[in-house]
Amino acid sequence: MNTGRQITIIGAGLAGALLATLLAQRGWRVEVFERRGDPRLHGYAGGRSINLALAERGLHALRQAGTDDAVMRQAVMMRGRMVHPLDGQPELQRYGRDDSEVIWSINRGELNIVLIEAAEAAGATLHFDRRLEQVDFDRSTFVVKGDGHEEKRSFAALVGADGAGSTLRGQMAQVADLGERIDWLDHGYKELEIPPGPGGSFRIEPNALHIWPRGHYMCIALPNDERTFTVTLFMPHAGPHPSFETVPDGDAAADFFASDFADAVPLIPQLEADYERNPVGSLATLTLDRWRIDGRAVLVGDAAHAMVPFHGQGMNCAFEDCVALADALESHDAFEAAFSAFEAERMPNAAAIQHMALENYLEMRDRVDDADYRLQRALELMLQDRHPHRFVPHYAMVSFMRIPYAVALERSEIQRGILQRATAGIEHLDAIDWAAVDADVRSRLGLLEGTPA
């Protein structure tokens, strides 16, 4: 157990507020400094409204903090992807086998407020409208600015939970080489909205993530508890049509949607206005060679490993970070030992989910309406039934279990090879050579720890 029992967190977003809750509940003296105003007074001003997908990893962390009930009251179940092809009827592709294997759509702002209130209830002290300006790591002091004046404070250890543009990370980089690399995706995003239907009802199936896959671009729509959907258009920033360069305004967007997302047009009555009002967002993967400066500072969540949103795991991974760091701080007598153990545990897993998130983008936009993909998905579920302790579908390992991401990635790559070999040159499952496939599974996959008995 760390004997200092004092810690300072920079950032009261999702990860910062959850970590503050977990530590305060364990008796730590926690102070949190947040550059934005209190969202309970001024509304949420996070700059992003992409809905978040809450899966088992994130739910486990919320259970540890005792906030799962409050969060789930606001969540909307998503059973799978509702795929809207260019021609034809929408089709639901389930994430799992039944309603015990689902994910949940949650509003970022509402979730943040629940976690802030939990942190304060646990005894953490939160300071809003306080921007980190400078850190003196040698003297263990930092300066925050707010209300027109600067204030110098001391710290025992700092945790950076201040997002992809982390100010603390910038301060750390001035005194240590973090090996920072930012890989920008050539695709951006723009948000639109499907409002409630007549009588305040959902306009389309609420218990699904809707996706309009179109090759190198796509739309998705996630349900909100106020009967709206947040629609996100992903396509290249520039280049041949369609791109944000070739679809520059509302009129062009109306024509584009009429030709490429025709069934979505009547659902988005403010399409032109939304398109012109909302900015084009950028997407990137952040990697670092180190997340800490000995025992003085450590980074968590997006501040350490921002990722593209296409596996719905950014928040879930950040919440796993919070639990891992809280556990490490309880298990080690010194901050340096705790931060080192945390980094060693989480860094390879963050790298794995970053890789899988990029892979999932290609799957979502290119493959979900592909016949070979659907055949392999059907075989995947059958192999899960035939080998429940060996062959667990990729999505199940990532979203419904808490096995390390790195293990999920390793096994997923093996399983992809099994599926490709089994379906090569065939069009129907009745042509599968089951003896060969079963032997392939047994020879390449060991028993997976944590699978249901």
Residue ranges, per PLM feature:
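C-terminal helical "tail/cap" subdomain of flavin- and related membrane-associated enzymes
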Residues: 3-5, 327-453
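Conserved Rossmann-like nucleotide-cofactor binding loop
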Residues: 15, 38, 165
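Acidic/histidine metal-binding catalytic segments
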Residues: 73-77, 259-276, 334-341, 350-355
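Conserved N-terminal helical subregion
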Residues: 2-6, 54-193, 250, 434, ...
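Glycine-rich FAD pyrophosphate-binding loop
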Residues: 24-46
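Generic enzyme active-site microenvironment
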Residues: 32-33, 127, 160, 300
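Conserved mid-domain beta->alpha element of the FAD-binding
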Residues: 10-21, 25, 159-160, 192, ...
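Conserved FAD-binding catalytic core of PHBH/FMO-like flavoproteins
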Residues: 117, 121, 130-134, 139-280, ...
